[in-house]
């Protein structure tokens, strides 16, 4: 019924842009304390507790990458 081939190209929503945006929200460095609380008692939580500088740098890099990819995906839509 709503086959994507039948829809006009301007109505296609860039799903990759939304996925990259969601990853940017999850890996934002300001969410590091929330991640530490949520992951408490797990191996990932122990890693965050012991190596918080490495985790913050890694999350910041991933955040910048995913944010730039999300902005590029939404900019290509226009």
Swiss-Prot record:
Protein name: Broad mercury transporter MerE
GO cellular component, one term: plasma membrane
Any Pfam family matching the protein: MerE
GO molecular function: mercury ion transmembrane transporter activity
Highest taxon in the source lineage: Bacteria
Residues annotated as transmembrane: 19-39, 45-65
Primary gene name: merE
UniProt keyword terms in alphabetical order: Cell inner membrane, Cell membrane, Membrane, Mercuric resistance, Plasmid, Transmembrane, Transmembrane helix, Transport, Transposable element
Entry membrane topology: Multi-pass membrane protein
Compartment(s) of residence: Cell inner membrane
Predominant location: membrane
Role played: Broad mercury transporter that mediates the transport of both CH(3)Hg(I) and Hg(II) across the membrane.
InterPro entries on file: MerE
């Amino acid at each position: 019924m709503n086959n994507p081939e039948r829809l006009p190209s301007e109505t296609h929503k860039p799903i990759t842009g939304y996925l990259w945006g969601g990853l940017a929200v999850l890996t934002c460095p300001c969410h590091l304390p929330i991640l530490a609380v949520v992951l408490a008692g797990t191996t990932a939580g122990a890693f965050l507790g012991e190596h918080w500088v490495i985790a913050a740098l890694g999350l910041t890099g991933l955040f910048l990458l995913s944010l730039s990819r999300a902005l590029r995906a939404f900019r290509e839509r226009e």
